[in-house]
From Swiss-Prot:
Lectin involved in the quality control of the secretory pathway. As a member of the endoplasmic reticulum-associated degradation lumenal (ERAD-L) surveillance system, targets misfolded endoplasmic reticulum lumenal glycoproteins for degradation. It comes from Aspergillus fumigatus (strain ATCC MYA-4609 / CBS 101355 / FGSC A1100 / Af293). This is Protein OS-9 homolog. It is found in: Endoplasmic reticulum membrane. InterPro entries: Man6P_isomerase_rcpt-bd_dom_sf, MRH_dom, OS-9-like, OS9-like_dom.
Length: 520
C-alpha cells in the first residue's frame, strides 16, 4: 500500500498543478498536505479498457492539444480537422464526446500492470484575467475587507460590559471588552471565595497587558480629520490557511521592567460556531508582548468569518488496460472473487469480534487456545468434592492406592486419618472427603452426631494432616498439642430426620465436619 501511495503521489501533484483547481476551490496554503487533504482522489474501479481504445484516447488528446496550439495562429477558423486515417462515423462521435468531457488521460504503469487514468479538468478563471480585471479584483477585495471589518466590530459590540477569564497555573487573566486585559494572581477557592470567576489577590502584583482606545475620545475627535481613525486602525482582518479572523492590537499596558516599554497584546477573534465566548489560549511571544485568541460565535453571523468548508475531492479513475486475449481471463477472475466475497459474507462468526478480539471466547489476547482463568474472588463458593473413604452402616469403603496417587495423596497417611476418624466417631458413620475450594485443597472428615454428644462435639478441634509424607509429623503434632483449635473450622449440617413424628430433639441432629488441611 505504501508503494502504491508513493507511485500515485506524482500523479496527484501533476493533477493539482495542471488543472488549476487550487485557485478556484480555496485559498492556497503552503502547509496543506496533498495526501491528507487531497483535491484529487484516485479510484481503481473494477473495470477495464481495451488497449486499442486506450491508444485512441491518448492519440486524440495529443492531437487536440496540437490543434489548440495552432489555433492561436489561425483566428476565425474552426477547430482543426484530424487528417489521419479515415474513421467511421461512430468513432467520430466518440471522439467529440471524449474531447468535450473535460478529462485528460495519462497512462500509468503500476506493479507491472498498465492503467489509463482519467483526470478531471477544473476551470480556473483567475489566471485568464487581464491586468485591468486584476486591478478591479484587488479594489473589490479591499472593499470587502473594509466591509467585513466594520461588520465584525459591529458584531463584537455585543460583548461590551462583559468580562471573560482564563486560568493558567499561577496566573489568571481577565478580558473586559472595550476596557482592558489584566494579568493577576487569583485567591485559592474556599469559604467565601468562589471558584469562578477568579478573585484577584490584592497582596500580589498584577499587570495590565493592554487597554482599548477610549471610545469617548473618538466621539470628541470625530470632526477632526487629523485625529480621526479609520476602521483598519482600530481592527484588522487577516487571512491564514483559508480562514479569516479579526485582529485588534492593544497597547498602553503596565510598563515592563526589562524593556522599559509598555506591555502590549494582540487579540485575535475567531469564529467558532459550537462555542460560547471564551478565551482559547494566551502566551507571551516575546518579552512583555502577548497573544490572546478568543473564540466567539458572534463573528459566525458574517460569511466572511466562517471557517473554510472542505471541498470534495475530484475523482481520478484508473482502469486496467487489457488486450482482447486477456479479457476472458480477467472476467473469470472477477467472477471468482465475487463468489468468494459472497461466501465470506455468509459466514457469521460464533462470537462478536471487537478489535480482532473474540468477545466471550475466553481466550488470552495474542495467545491461541488459552482459556482465561477466573480470579480468586470469582471462584468463592465453588467446591469440588471427592469421597476418599467412608463408613456407612458399619461397612468401610475407600479409594484404591492408584486412585489416591492421582490426587497426590499418600495411602499410609490416609489410613492414619481413617483410624483417627474411627476413634472420634466411636462407632458412628463417618466420611473422609478431599475438597478443592478457593484455589486450596484440604481433607474434610464428617462424623454423624447425636444429641447426647453435642457437648463433646463442641470440644473437638480440627486435625491438620498434610498430603505429603514430609510434613506428616507436623500435622499429627498439631492435633496432639491442641494448637489447631484456634484454626479449626467446625460446622453442623442439619438434615431432615427419617422418623415420622418430628420432635425437638430430632431437629437438632446433625453431623460434625473435621478439616484436615492438605499442604501441597
Amino acid at each position: 500500500m505504501i508503494r502504491r501511495i508513493r507511485t500515485l503521489t506524482p500523479l496527484l501533484v501533476l493533477a493539482c498543478a495542471g488543472s488549476g483547481a487550487w485557485a478556484s476551490k480555496k485559498a492556497f496554503n503552503i502547509q496543506d498536505d496533498l495526501l491528507a487533504y487531497p483535491q484529487f482522489q484516485v479510484f481503481f474501479p473494477d473495470e477495464y479498457i481495451l488497449d486499442a481504445r486506450a491508444r485512441e484516447l491518448l492519440q486524440n488528446q495529443q492531437e487536440s492539444s496540437s490543434a489548440s496550439a495552432d489555433k492561436t495562429f489561425s483566428e476565425g477558423n474552426d477547430a482543426q480537422v484530424y487528417l489521419g486515417s479515415r474513421k467511421d462515423q461512430s468513432e467520430d462521435v466518440n471522439k467529440e464526446t471524449i474531447e468535450g468531457s473535460g478529462f485528460t488521460y495519462e497512462e500509468m504503469l503500476l506493479e507491472g500492470q498498465r492503467y489509463l487514468c482519467s483526470i478531471p479538468q477544473v476551470d480556473n478563471g483567475n489566471r485568464d484575467q487581464t491586468n485591468g480585471a486584476e486591478s478591479t479584483s484587488k479594489e473589490d477585495e479591499q472593499r470587502e475587507i473594509a466591509r467585513a471589518t466594520d461588520r465584525g466590530l459591529e458584531l463584537l459590540r455585543e460583548m461590551e460590559g462583559k468580562c471573560m477569564y482564563y486560568i493558567s497555573g499561577w496566573w489568571s487573566y481577565s478580558f473586559c471588552y472595550k476596557k482592558q486585559i489584566k494579568q493577576f494572581h487569583a485567591l485559592p477557592s474556599g469559604p467565601g471565595v468562589p471558584n469562578y470567576p477568579p478573585i484577584e489577590d490584592s497582596t500580589t502584583h498584577s499587570f495590565v497587558l493592554g487597554r482599548f482606545p477610549n471610545s469617548g475620545d473618538d466621539e470628541d475627535l470625530e470632526g477632526d480629520a487629523e485625529h480621526k481613525k479609520t476602521t483598519t486602525d482600530v481592527a484588522e482582518l487577516q487571512t491564514k490557511g483559508g480562514s479569516r479572523y479579526l485582529v485588534q492590537r492593544l497597547g498602553g499596558g503596565t510598563k515592563c521592567d526589562l524593556t522599559g516599554k509598555d506591555r502590549k497584546i494582540e487579540v485575535q477573534f475567531h469564529c467558532h460556531p459550537q462555542s460560547t465566548d471564551r478565551i482559547g489560549w494566551i502566551k507571551e511571544l516575546t518579552t512583555c508582548s502577548y497573544l490572546m485568541v478568543i473564540y466567539t460565535p458572534r463573528l459566525c453571523n458574517d460569511v466572511a468569518f466562517l471557517p473554510p468548508q472542505q471541498d470534495e475531492a475530484h475523482a481520478i479513475e484508473c482502469r486496467e488496460i487489457l488486450s482482447e486475449e486477456e479479457v476472458s481471463d480477467w472476467e473469470a477472475n472477477r467472477e471468482y472473487h465475487l463468489a468468494q466475497q459472497l461466501v465470506e459474507s455468509a459466514i457469521t462468526p460464533e462470537f462478536p469480534v471487537v478489535g480482532d478480539i473474540e468477545v466471550g471466547a475466553h481466550k488470552w489476547v495474542g495467545s491461541e487456545g488459552k482459556q482465561i482463568e477466573k480470579g480468586r474472588v470469582a471462584s468463592i463458593g465453588e467446591e469440588k468434592i471427592e469421597v476418599v473413604a467412608k463408613r456407612q452402616n458399619g461397612e468401610i469403603t475407600r479409594l484404591s492406592k492408584e486412585e489416591l496417587k492421582k490426587y497426590g495423596l499418600d495411602p499410609e497417611k490416609i489410613e492414619t486419618l481413617k483410624s483417627r476418624l474411627e476413634e472420634l466417631a466411636k462407632g458412628k458413620d463417618w466420611t473422609l472427603e478431599i475438597v478443592e475450594s478457593n484455589g486450596e485443597r484440604g481433607l474434610v472428615g464428617t462424623v454423624d452426631s447425636n444429641d447426647d454428644e453435642k457437648e463433646d462435639h463442641a470440644a473437638q478441634g480440627s486435625i491438620s494432616q498434610p498430603a505429603q509424607g514430609t510434613t506428616a509429623d507436623k500435622g499429627e503434632s498439631n492435633a496432639e498439642t491442641g494448637e489447631e483449635k484456634k484454626k479449626a473450622d467446625e460446622k453442623i449440617d442439619h438434615y431432615e430426620p427419617e422418623k415420622s413424628g418430628p420432635t425437638t430433639d430430632d431437629a437438632d441432629d446433625g453431623s460434625e465436619e473435621i478439616f484436615f488441611k492438605d499442604e501441597l
